[in-house]
Amino acid sequence: SDPQRYAWLGFGPDGNEGGLNWDVIAAVGQAVKAGKLTGPLKVRKTVIGGWSGSGALTLFFANTFHMRERMEDGGPIFDAVLLGEPGWYPRINADSGDLIAYDVRQRPAMLDVPMISVNSSAPIEFGMPFRPRADSDDPKGRFRAYEVAGADHRGAREPTFNNPQEDCGAALSDFPLHRYYSLAIDHLKRWSDEGKA
């Protein structure tokens, strides 16, 4: 990168304009779905998803921009949504305020594509504001919530804390949460392809 060349670009007073997230997610999704970034590979379906912080961005995009940002033919950019324990709700841009805890906007919206949410017991244990809605097969709001009891937010494959102050000496969970996330991906694919949850 060239700091002098790009010095004129501004991203808010603290150098972080989160409002650009939504434009980037939409533009990249549209380009991928249109086959502009995939070379000889053909795109059959696009899925948006993430875990923890990126899960929160996924929830925000799905709730706020999924029905607004579309392909040229009016169809969805993303054919399915996978929410991985979004524990907070990001601001729409650098100037907006935080949502209050348990704001209704932290609940997954009714969309025209299937959505699966995977959660450990952390949202309950730590009072995270995200709460899934009821399971539904309604074509205007297909949704499933997989709540995995006994799992922690990070899962067994995550590295241990590097900060000794955060390590209380107790054994970390060996619960294979990643397997449930993989299972959710498989179920979401089947639901999107075959219409079976």
List PLM regions with ranges.
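C-terminal His-loop and adjacent cap/lid subdomain of alpha/beta-hydrolase
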Residues: S1-A197
